[in-house]
Amino acid sequence: MSLYATQDEKKQAAAKAALKHLPKGGILGVGTGSTVNFLIDLLPELQLEAAVASSQATADRLKKLGIEVVDMNHVVSLDAYVDGADEIDRHMHMIKGGGAALTREKIVASIAKKFVCIVDDSKWVDQLGRDFPLPVEVIPMARSAVARKLVSLGGDPVYREGVVTDNGNVILDVFNLNILNAIDLEKTINNIPGVVTNGIFALNPATIAIVATNDGIEERTAQ
């Protein structure tokens, strides 16, 4: 029997458990997505100096709570970055980008001293990419050329109709990739001309994962 009646209750529990891993005061990097939204609603407790947002949606939610949102160009480093994931494995490698904010998420995470990932256990996987497609942000004019390259890597790219990123680009969701070496594949896809970035977060993995399971909260680190 689960401690939580719904998936949302699991997400709320993970968000609450993450607070102790985040700095009080200071500037926090904040990701995007349904789990992060639960966390954002708790952030006033931390009395942050400010936050750097990974998307316009996150920035808007932070501002509604009275939290100042600053441009990343004015920040040298962040004490922590907190975000969810579409998938995460025991190496703390992740697939992200279901909400199409992957590029800004990756940029903000890159200047953080630690990456706190908050998920429910449905996102914990043995191998990335089996159940969730890999999002790739692409400059619009390169969409078809990039898709052909992704096919040559063994993937089945699908154009995410009607979605334009905050950067004005499009998303290809790549199914059936065999992600055995996440670091190498992240590099390979990022080197395709026209790719802005892809949703593998392996070069800069999570520091700790806060995982809500049926039995409660587990804190996991790379194995």
From Swiss-Prot:
Residues passing through the membrane, by range: none
Protein origin, superkingdom: Bacteria
Function text: Catalyzes the reversible conversion of ribose-5-phosphate to ribulose 5-phosphate.
Family: Belongs to the ribose 5-phosphate isomerase family.
Its EC number(s): 5.3.1.6
This protein's name: Ribose-5-phosphate isomerase A
Listed GO biological process terms: D-ribose metabolic process; pentose-phosphate shunt, non-oxidative branch
Sites where the protein binds substrate: T32, G33, S34, T35, D83, G84, A85, D86, K96, G97, G98, G99, K123
Pathway: Carbohydrate degradation; pentose phosphate pathway; D-ribose 5-phosphate from D-ribulose 5-phosphate (non-oxidative stage): step 1/1
Gene3D superfamilies: 3.30.70.260, 3.40.50.1360
Keywords, alphabetical: Isomerase
Positions of the catalytic residues: E105
A single GO cellular-component term on record: cytosol
Molecular function per GO: ribose-5-phosphate isomerase activity
NCBIfam families registered for this protein in UniProt: PRK00702.1, rpiA
Enzyme class: isomerase
Subunit details: Homodimer.
Pfam families hit by this protein: Rib_5-P_isom_A (PF06026)
Catalytic activity as recorded in UniProt: aldehydo-D-ribose 5-phosphate = D-ribulose 5-phosphate
UniProt organism field: Acinetobacter baumannii (strain SDF)
